[in-house]
Amino acid sequence: MCAARMAAAAQSVYSFSAHPLAGGEPVNLGSLRGKVLLIENVASLUGTTVRDYTQMNELQERLGPRALVVLGFPCNQFGHQENAKNEEILNSLKYVRPGGGFEPNFMLFQKCEVNGAKASPLFAFLREALPPPSDDPTALMTDPKFITWCPVCRNDVSWSFEKFLVGPDGVPVRRYSRRFPTIDIEPDIQALLSKGSGGA
């Protein structure tokens, strides 16, 4: 089934799976039922790589015990800022950017496309469920030379490090632009975690 048809048929992220960056069996997102998910398309050479990767680690470390799961999906569609091979990405993060021995403590998956005909079915679904980022409803890729995919849609991801927050029922709740710092999503995450635990 093509990505668009899979996305149209889905009611939650639990319909999708993804291949871990380290290899092995695909992770069925249904196995994360009951967790709050923060999903980001990431890149090793973006201007916000250091900020967002370190903040993703921070949120996973502090809120993971309360049922937050951070998921990163490397993508090379924006300025070719993830041009490493899958097997090179962890070393790039460790030694280049963020560097200093950095290791992600959250799940990273194999490179995928998030826009266009070859978009990951998960991202096609997320874009349909949450068309504009909540903090920047007019966010668009505005420089034609950077548009490397087809077809171009109004709900396309506009750059690396867009964020999608998914509730414990697997339904997307909110989308944030690349300009929105990952750490600033914490109040929304805390609200979902409290709701999921009955307000405890």
From Swiss-Prot:
It catalyses: 2 glutathione + H2O2 = glutathione disulfide + 2 H2O; a hydroperoxy polyunsaturated fatty acid + 2 glutathione = a hydroxy polyunsaturated fatty acid + glutathione disulfide + H2O; tert-butyl hydroperoxide + 2 glutathione = tert-butanol + glutathione disulfide + H2O; cumene hydroperoxide + 2 glutathione = 2-phenylpropan-2-ol + glutathione disulfide + H2O. Its EC number is 1.11.1.9, 1.11.1.12. It comes from the Eukaryota. CDD domains: GSH_Peroxidase. The modification N6-succinyllysine is found at K85, K111, K145. GO terms for biological process: arachidonate metabolic process; glutathione metabolic process; hydrogen peroxide catabolic process; lipoxygenase pathway; response to hydrogen peroxide; response to selenium ion. Keywords: Acetylation, Cytoplasm, Lipid metabolism, Mitochondrion, Oxidoreductase, Peroxidase, Phosphoprotein, Selenocysteine. One of its GO terms (molecular function) is phospholipid-hydroperoxide glutathione peroxidase activity. The modification N6-acetyllysine is found at K85, K111, K118, K145. InterPro entries: Glutathione_peroxidase (IPR000889), GPX_AS (IPR029759), GPX_CS (IPR029760), Thioredoxin-like_sf (IPR036249). Homotetramer. Interacts with MIEN1. Belongs to the glutathione peroxidase family. Catalyzes the reduction of hydroperoxides in a glutathione-dependent manner thus regulating cellular redox homeostasis. Can reduce small soluble hydroperoxides such as H2O2, cumene hydroperoxide and tert-butyl hydroperoxide, as well as several fatty acid-derived hydroperoxides. In platelets catalyzes the reduction of 12-hydroperoxyeicosatetraenoic acid, the primary product of the arachidonate 12-lipoxygenase pathway. PANTHER family: GLUTATHIONE PEROXIDASE, GLUTATHIONE PEROXIDASE 1. This is Glutathione peroxidase 1. It comes from Oryctolagus cuniculus (Rabbit).
